[in-house]
Amino acid sequence: QQQYGSKLHLIEREGKQGLGTAYIRGFEFALEHEYDYVCEMDADFSHNPNDLMELYKACAYGGADVAIGSRYIKGVNVVNWPMGRVLMSYFASIYVRLVTGIPVMDTTAGFKCYHRSVLETIDPEKIRFIGYAFQIEMKFTAWKHGFKITEVPIIFTDRAKGTSKMSKGIFKEAVIGVLQMKIGSLFRKYEPYQETSVSQSAA
């Protein structure tokens, strides 16, 4: 805060309310402050901050509505993960593509840039996942609304300290949840976004 002053905002919440609700609160903050581009990433440097500009440029100048920092668009670019974790993540993305039809290689990625129109269109009340499957549901919902999604290759380096919260329970929840999400989408209408004007500010 001493270095960035008013540019750094810390939002504190009571208790554990889930990963998804934390993201949604951050999105709400960005929309309230009229930012046009909103990025999300892991704060443990698993995601390289130097890649942020590539995601931003893919949206601001490349025509994408959602830019994903992808581990799997050019082979498998993951460092310091055990092989079991790599295989679980890789095949989870294949599973999601097969079930949903979404044309995204890294469906579980958490490194993304959104244009504000995506976050304005997606109703947070209809996002049912609050765990890691939240990442899948946001991409799927954006795609169903007709937004353009692109993937930017990155190298994901696992955290040097701390432990992952990933578990078999979370994985199982995502597997079942993807089926439920796909079935639910058959009975839901996704209104296409109606473009108006676009300005050029970013957060």
What are these regions (language model features)?
Residues 8-32, 37, 49-132, 159-169, ...:
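Acceptor/aglycone-binding surface of glycosyltransferases and processive sugar-polymer synthases
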Residues 101, 125-203:
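Hydrophobic helical membrane-anchoring modules
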